[in-house]
C-alpha cells in the first residue's frame, strides 16, 4: 500500500512539474516581452494563458525530420533521456510523508546532474553536424567546469548539516535562513545554477550568433520540444534547490512556492538583461574564482566542525577532571 501511495505521489509530482514547465515558458515570454517594451503572447484565450498548450500541440504535430547522416538511435534517444533525467532528479525533493525520502538525496542530485552532460554531448555528436558538435563540446566543457564548484558547495552544506538528506535543511533553518549567514555562497550558487542550466549569460551551448542554435540545430518537432522541456524542468529544479538550501525548506508552506517562483523569475530576468559572457572569461570565472571560493568554504566548514567537536571534548574532560 505504501509503495502504491509513493508511486501515485511521484506521478503527481511529475505531472505538476510538466504543467509548471508549460507555464514557465509563458512567464518567460511575458517577462521578456515587457523587458523589450511589448506585450508578449496575448492572442490565444484570456491574456494568452492557453498559449503553452497550443505550442505543445503545434510542436508535436509538426513533421519529424530525419537527417540522413545522423546516428539514428542516439540522435532520438538523447532528448528522451534528457527529459527523463530532469524529471527523475525531482525524486530528491524533501518530503515528510508518503514519498521517497532519500537519505542520500544530495548524492543523488550530484549523480543526476553529472549524467546530464552526456545527453548534450551525445545529442551534438549524433547529429553529425559541425555546429551541433561544437555546441555539444562547449556545453560539456562548461558543465564540467561548473560542476566541480557545485559539488564542493554541496559538500560544504553536507558537512554543515551533517547529512545527505535534504530534509535536514528544514530543521537547521527553522529560526534563520542560510541566505542570511551565507550570502556570498548563495550568489555563487545562483551563478553556478545559471551555468548548469545553460542560461544567459552562460548559454554557450546554444549561441545563435556563433553556432546557429548550437547542439539542437538538427532537432525539430518532438525532439526539439523535449530538449527545451528538460531545460525548463532543470530551471525549476535548481530554483527549488536554492529555496531548500538557502530560503528555509518549508515545502508545505505556500510561501515556499512564492520563493520558488521568484527565483525562476530571476533566471528569466537574467536572460532579458545580461549579455553573453566571453568563453575564456567563463573558464577563468569557473577555475580561478569559484573553485577557490568553494574550496575555502569547504575547508572553513570542516575546520568549524573540528573546532566545535574539540571544544565539546574540552568541556567534557574538564568536567571529568573537576569531578575527580
From Swiss-Prot:
One of its GO terms (biological process) is aerobic respiration. The chain crosses the membrane at residues 3-23, 77-97, 104-124, 150-170, 174-194, 226-246, 250-270, 297-317. GO terms for cellular component: mitochondrial inner membrane; respiratory chain complex I. It is a multi-pass membrane protein. It catalyses: a ubiquinone + NADH + 5 H(+)(in) = a ubiquinol + NAD(+) + 4 H(+)(out). Signal peptide: none annotated. It holds the Pfam family NADHdh. One of its GO terms (molecular function) is NADH dehydrogenase (ubiquinone) activity. It is found in: Mitochondrion inner membrane. Keywords: Electron transport, Membrane, Mitochondrion, Mitochondrion inner membrane, NAD, Respiratory chain, Translocase, Transmembrane, Transmembrane helix, Transport, Ubiquinone. The keyword Lipid metabolism does not apply. Its EC number is 7.1.1.2. InterPro entries: NADH_UbQ_OxRdtase_su1/FPO, NADH_UbQ_OxRdtase_su1_CS. Belongs to the complex I subunit 1 family. Core subunit of the mitochondrial membrane respiratory chain NADH dehydrogenase (Complex I) that is believed to belong to the minimal assembly required for catalysis. Complex I functions in the transfer of electrons from NADH to the respiratory chain. The immediate electron acceptor for the enzyme is believed to be ubiquinone. This is NADH-ubiquinone oxidoreductase chain 1. It comes from Drosophila yakuba.
Amino acid at each position: 500500500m505504501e509503495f502504491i501511495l509513493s508511486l501515485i505521489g511521484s506521478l503527481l509530482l511529475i505531472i505538476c512539474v510538466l504543467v509548471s514547465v508549460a507555464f514557465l515558458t509563458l512567464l518567460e515570454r511575458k517577462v521578456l516581452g515587457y523587458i523589450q517594451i511589448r506585450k508578449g503572447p496575448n492572442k490565444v484565450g484570456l491574456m494568452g494563458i492557453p498559449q503553452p498548450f497550443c505550442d505543445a500541440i503545434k510542436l508535436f504535430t509538426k513533421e519529424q525530420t530525419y537527417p540522413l547522416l545522423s546516428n539514428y538511435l542516439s540522435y532520438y534517444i538523447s532528448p528522451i533521456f534528457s527529459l527523463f533525467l530532469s524529471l527523475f532528479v525531482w525524486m530528491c525533493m524533501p518530503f515528510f510523508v508518503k514519498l521517497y525520502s532519500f537519505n542520500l538525496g544530495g548524492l543523488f542530485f550530484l549523480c543526476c546532474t553529472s549524467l546530464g552532460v552526456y545527453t548534450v554531448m551525445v545529442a551534438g555528436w549524433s547529429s553529425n553536424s559541425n555546429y551541433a558538435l561544437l555546441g555539444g563540446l562547449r556545453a560539456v566543457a562548461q558543465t564540467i567546469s561548473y560542476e566541480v564548484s557545485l559539488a564542493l558547495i554541496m559538500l560544504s552544506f553536507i558537512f554543515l548539516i551533517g547529512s545527505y538528506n535534504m530534509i535536514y535543511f528544514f530543521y537547521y533553518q527553522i529560526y534563520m535562513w542560510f541566505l542570511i549567514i551565507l550570502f556570498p555562497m548563495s550568489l555563487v550558487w545562483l551563478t553556478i545554477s545559471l551555468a548548469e542550466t545553460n542560461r544567459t549569460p552562460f548559454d554557450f551551448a546554444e549561441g545563435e550568433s556563433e553556432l546557429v542554435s548550437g547542439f539542437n540545430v538538427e532537432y525539430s518537432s518532438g525532439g526539439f520540444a523535449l530538449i527545451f522541456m528538460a531545460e525548463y524542468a532543470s530551471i525549476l529544479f535548481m530554483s527549488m534547490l536554492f529555496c531548500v538550501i538557502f530560503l528555509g525548506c518549508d515545502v508545505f508552506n505556500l510561501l515556499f512556492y512564492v520563493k520558488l517562483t521568484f527565483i525562476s523569475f530571476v533566471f528569466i530576468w537574467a536572460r532579458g538583461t545580461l549579455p553573453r559572457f566571453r568563453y575564456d572569461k567563463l573558464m577563468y570565472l569557473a577555475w580561478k574564482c569559484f573553485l577557490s571560493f568553494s574550496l575555502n568554504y569547504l575547508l572553513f566548514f570542516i575546520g568549524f566542525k573540528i573546532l566545535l567537536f574539540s571544544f565539546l571534548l574540552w568541556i567534557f574532560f574538564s568536567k571529568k577532571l573537576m569531578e575527580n
